[in-house]
């Protein structure tokens, strides 16, 4: 009987935490299921960006930055299976020009510095601060998160740079030294010829890229790629992607081509997780080197993962992400 009473007491003790996580009392987004459109001021006018909150935790609030540039938030939806159980409050967010957000189709707005200011405006609107704000970005989102931290780290409690080197020149060097030599020479030559001829919007170009993508972007047969990943790609703002990144994931040739912040990483004192996959398009050794440059950092390599380790090494990726957040929250980092 005493054992039964103890079990019931423990169950009751856990219940308030669970119920509080789903408590929307006083939330102005309760009637929309957590969705909120945030007006963003830009040099070209004011536009709305889409966000959606999941959960309620005053101590831990995670803003998710998607990659691309130009992809939408759906990629992150796998976290629905993990974050609620860990009590993590998190926010989906489509950047301007992507997904459910406004797309003014003005290339002047596809600018890194402007996107940093956009993230800051989103932070202010969502009332995230140094006591609870974790910024998580993958690929281009990791680049954007790095740039944000360099300017606004006073607002951050934790930073996650996922599958993103802090130097595009170093990324391009890795692509030339390691990634391209491992490709089929005939296919690589045809890819490069199509790029030289300006024929990167053709089915043949996409067909030639798929073996590389299934090796280094998401290590699954294409027919098994999760639907939410495909949706994120299907809604890709291709014009933005090509302008900023270039036509493919084999290096970068767009307006971000000369971006390099490695030397500035030492100024970031925010606790940081640098995470990537063993088979990533991003050099795992370089990611480790970044952690030595940062003031307070941890490096995780997902041993079965690629650029999207959230899907091809999901348990390692999600457990590492949650462990980092909990360690920072509990003062163990």
Regions found by a protein language model. Name each.
Residues 262-304:
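Conserved loop-alpha-helix segment in the C-terminal half of the alpha/beta-hydrolase fold
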Residues 24-48:
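N-terminal cap/lid segment of alpha/beta-hydrolase-fold proteins
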Residues 131-174:
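Conserved hydrolase catalytic core segment
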Residues 95-136, 140:
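Active-site loop/oxyanion-hole signature of alpha/beta-hydrolase fold enzymes
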Residues 297-333:
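Catalytic active-site module of serine/aspartate enzymes centered on a nucleophile-bearing elbow/loop
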Residues 186-266, 270:
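Alpha/beta-hydrolase
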Residues 47-103:
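Conserved HGGG/HGGXW glycine-rich cap/lid loop of the alpha/beta-hydrolase fold
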Residues 159-199:
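Flexible "cap/lid" loop of the alpha/beta hydrolase fold
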């Amino acid at each position: 009987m005493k054992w039964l009473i103890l079990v019931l007491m423990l169950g009751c003790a856990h219940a308030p935490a669970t119920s509080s996580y789903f408590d929307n009392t006083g939330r102005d987004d309760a009637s929309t299921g957590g969705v909120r459109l945030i007006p963003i001021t830009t040099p070209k006018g004011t536009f709305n960006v889409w966000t959606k909150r999941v959960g309620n935790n005053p101590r831990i609030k995670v803003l998710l930055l998607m990659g691309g540039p130009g992809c939408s938030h759906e990629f992150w939806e796998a976290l629905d299976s993990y974050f609620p159980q860990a009590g993590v409050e998190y926010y989906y967010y489509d950047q301007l020009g992507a997904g459910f957000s406004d797309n003014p189709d003005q290339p002047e707005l596809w600018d890194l510095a402007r996107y940093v200011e956009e993230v800051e405006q989103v932070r202010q609107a969502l009332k995230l601060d140094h006591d609870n704000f974790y910024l998580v970005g993958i690929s281009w989102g990791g680049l954007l998160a790095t740039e944000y931290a360099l300017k606004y780290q006073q607002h951050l409690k934790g930073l996650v740079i996922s599958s993103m080197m802090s130097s595009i020149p170093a990324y391009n060097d890795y692509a030339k030294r390691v990634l391209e030599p491992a490709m089929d020479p005939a296919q690589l030559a045809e890819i490069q010829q199509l790029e030289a001829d300006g024929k990167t919007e053709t089915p043949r170009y996409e067909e030639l890229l798929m073996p590389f993508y299934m090796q280094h972007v998401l290590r699954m047969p294409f027919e098994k790629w999760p639907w939410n990943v495909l949706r994120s790609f299907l809604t890709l703002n291709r014009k933005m992607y090509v302008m900023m990144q270039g036509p493919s994931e084999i290096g970068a040739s767009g307006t971000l081509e000369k971006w390099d912040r490695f030397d500035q990483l030492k100024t970031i004192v925010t606790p940081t997780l640098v995470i990537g996959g063993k088979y990533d398009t991003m050099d795992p050794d370089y990611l480790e080197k970044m952690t030595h440059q940062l003031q307070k950092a941890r490096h995780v390599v997902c041993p079965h993962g690629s650029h999207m380790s959230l899907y091809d090494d999901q348990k390692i990726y999600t457990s590492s992400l949650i462990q980092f957040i909990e360690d920072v929250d509990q003062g163990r980092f």
